[in-house]
Amino acid sequence: MYIGTVLKNIREEQGFSLLEIQKKTGIKESQLCRIESGIRFPTDDQIFILAKFYNIDSNQLQIQRESDKVLEIIKNIPNQRQVLDVAKQKLESNGNYLSVAADSIPGATIPLESRRYIGCKQKLVDWIFDIIKENTSGIKTATDIFAGTGVITKKMLHLYPNVIMNDTLYSNHIIYKAFFGNSEWSKEKITSKLSEYNSLNPKEINDNYFSVNFGGKYFDYDKAKLIGFIREDIENSKSELTEKEYAILLATLIYNIDKTANTLGHFEAYIKKPIKPTPLKLKLIDVQQFSNLQIFQEDSNELARSINSDLVYIDPPYNSRQYSRFYHVYETLVKWDKPVLSGVAMKPPAENMSKYCTSQAPKAFSDLIENLDAKYLAVSYNNTYNSKSGSLRNHITIKQIDEILSRKGNVEKFSWYDDNQEFLFIVKTR
């Protein structure tokens, strides 16, 4: 599916006309029409603006666009598949390379940044930390209190002597342990396990909890059978694994199935079209170990009362979209308590619901800021308060953010681009 078709499908699914998109984003209707019809490619800025508006992962849109460009270049070249295979083998991981390329390189590991996740700050990391470094000093301990994908923490680990990260999701917590945790692990043992899983034949595997509930919806049936079988085996092998090895296997499973899930990047719904079966070949994630990191899975407002940090980075969910519901498939996969699922999206009973996604958000944010013991606060804010979609509309206005932070100390406000959508507040506390 080409980038224009992807954007058109997303727009139509969310119920917007081209004229409405023009009014909300500033991108001309004529440009949007040419993009959706495949006449032109969207620019980086247009991709970022549209991704923010639709609340989807801009990295995935960029991958779609760049793959379209590659196909355009090679469409008249003979032996296209062989050319692509050789090109993939020549690619080297240079910084934040695209996972779609890295996954095709023999021996390459899957990077932390490659997971599809709403609100991921990967594109903004350098900008965020350039501002932080210019406006702070003497940082010994830094905290990422709503860690999400972990990309902010990853940057902190290379800048500061001590780092604290926190998130309430079970899937995120296990991913942090896998990518960053300092406990022992054997690469040989993990590689052996992955080879074992990659040799499985789905035709020889019986239906299981995962395939019965998610097969034919989020994944093709054969892949769903493999996922369920592998997850059960990881659980049965837990006594033979270290804490980090257990986490690595789970995170590796999540990262490998993430890019082929039949979704728009989250599990609020699946795409109601036939799923093209694809093989499941697990590649290891980019495992690292850090001794200067503490990993928590707590309510951020409660954790705020018990930690002391020179810098706290804050990026809560501002709109109604509950992350525990958007990523319920991964929560179920990690917890493996096999709950009874319901609804079209096959969700478990609601749990781990954030006050920041409700009308209680201003009160929760005020409580958080008041109880943090820190020299500096860095607060990200995406300005979707007046969004047409109720689920996208922020529960805290930028004015409320400013007022609450001003009670804590001296506030500086920075905007990432001219449309005043993405802000970073730096607070030097009193």
Question: What is each of the regions a protein language model found here?
Answer:
Residues R65-S104:
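Interfacial/linker helices and their anchor residues that mediate assembly or domain coupling
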Residues K355-G409:
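Conserved Class I SAM-dependent methyltransferase catalytic core
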Residues G26, T43-Q60:
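DNA major-groove recognition helix of helix-turn-helix/homeodomain DNA-binding modules
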Residues M1-E13:
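A short, Lys/Arg-rich alpha-helix, primarily the initiator
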Residues N162, T168-I285, S324-S359, K363:
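Class I S-adenosyl-L-methionine-dependent methyltransferase module
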Residues I128, T143-M156, M165-L169, R305-F326, ...:
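Conserved proline-anchored active-site loop of SAM-dependent methyltransferases
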Residues G15-R34:
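Short alpha-helical DNA-recognition segment
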Residues L98-S137, T141, V151-I152, H158:
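S-adenosyl-L-methionine
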